[in-house]
């Protein structure tokens, strides 16, 4: 199928693009299309290599998390169930990266047909939302463990069986626009068949802005509100606790880990969502500066790349930092892990209920 694309519109969207629905086809916002900068290819040459690096590292560490969960004997904790589903979402997201790396390598020429374009575009969006939603669930679960320790000790795995399907359903619903609109279109002046969001031409600007704002709200603003609120709640509660000796060390570890979760989420996803929001403003005609559009085009592929690194960081934030990680790893793979060995003293003083419950997240 062929569409008519203006040089400026195509240039803008080709360079701003790909997995997260920012690679679009045409539009009606004339002010955004009066910029005649050409697609910049040189700065994209490193992107496929970086995609493969993230794929290899992220796939390896998340496979370890899934293996630990599957080989774990006895009843599973609620937090472990969330961590497992987070790792699965990250694995599925990372599994699509080789295709998008190939897409970049061929300068946005999609080689895998329209069905694969729709499926893998939707697959990526679905698991991006699922990963973010499970990070939010983990933050809420940790908050409950600290603020309501006795109540949280009564949690049963079946409670997570209600939350997990709900999260996956929400992720599926969030990816429906991608599934509906993602398709292959021919861009004649570039000589490529691009995998794009094929919105109706007469309402292209409205759809583009709406989808961008949806990603901002569902994929960043709402999760960040929950994650940050839980962190400050944990911090306020623990700082009120009189802790001494080893109890204080545990408290400080918990606070550092909670802060690391917030910082990792912001560092990995804020650049992408800021650029996505600016892109929405250009579609709405609020931003008409060619310089701003050029910056969006240049920076967005790297912001997307930074967002993908969150899938590599998650296992270290939620699994690998624990005191019992070495024992779990050795029990699964039956090999000595000397590089993880270290002396740990047993706590001699009694912990408060909050710290004792929260210690399960650093053990």
Swiss-Prot record:
Extracellular side: 1-45, 105-114, 182-206, 282-294
Gene3D superfamilies the record matches: Rhodopsin 7-helix transmembrane proteins
InterPro entries: ATII_AT2_rcpt, ATII_rcpt, CCR1-9-like, GPCR_Rhodpsn, GPCR_Rhodpsn_7TM
Gene Ontology MF, one: G-protein alpha-subunit binding
Annotated localization: Cell membrane
TM stretches of this protein: 46-70, 81-104, 115-140, 160-181, 207-232, 258-281, 295-320
Alphabetically ordered keywords of this record: Cell membrane, Disulfide bond, G-protein coupled receptor, Glycoprotein, Membrane, Phosphoprotein, Receptor, Transducer, Transmembrane, Transmembrane helix
UniProt: angiotensin II binding residues: 103-104, 182, 204, 215, 279, 297
GO cellular component, one term: perinuclear region of cytoplasm
BP-aspect Gene Ontology terms: angiotensin-activated signaling pathway; angiotensin-mediated vasodilation involved in regulation of systemic arterial blood pressure; brain renin-angiotensin system; cell growth involved in cardiac muscle cell development; cell surface receptor signaling pathway; cellular response to dexamethasone stimulus; cerebellar cortex development; dopamine biosynthetic process
Segments of this protein annotated with the region Helix VIII: 324-333
Phosphoserine sites (modified residues): 354
Superkingdom of the organism of origin: Eukaryota
Cytoplasmic compartment residues: 71-80, 141-159, 233-257, 321-363
Pfam families hit by this protein: 7tm_1
Glycosylation sites: 4, 13, 24, 29, 34
Annotated disulfide bonds: 35-290, 117-195
Topological category with respect to the lipid bilayer: Multi-pass membrane protein
Subunit record text: Interacts with MTUS1.
Domain remark in the UniProt entry: Helix VIII may act as a gatekeeper for either suppression or activation of the receptor, depending on post-translational modifications and interactions with various receptor partners. Helix VIII is found in a non-canonical position, stabilizing the active-like state, but at the same time preventing the recruitment of G-proteins or beta-arrestins. Upon switching to a membrane-bound conformation, helix VIII can support the recruitment of G proteins and beta-arrestins.
Family recorded in the similarity comment: Belongs to the G-protein coupled receptor 1 family.
UniProt xrefs under PANTHER family: CELL ADHESION MOLECULE, TYPE-2 ANGIOTENSIN II RECEPTOR
Name of the protein this chain belongs to: Type-2 angiotensin II receptor
Organism: Rattus norvegicus
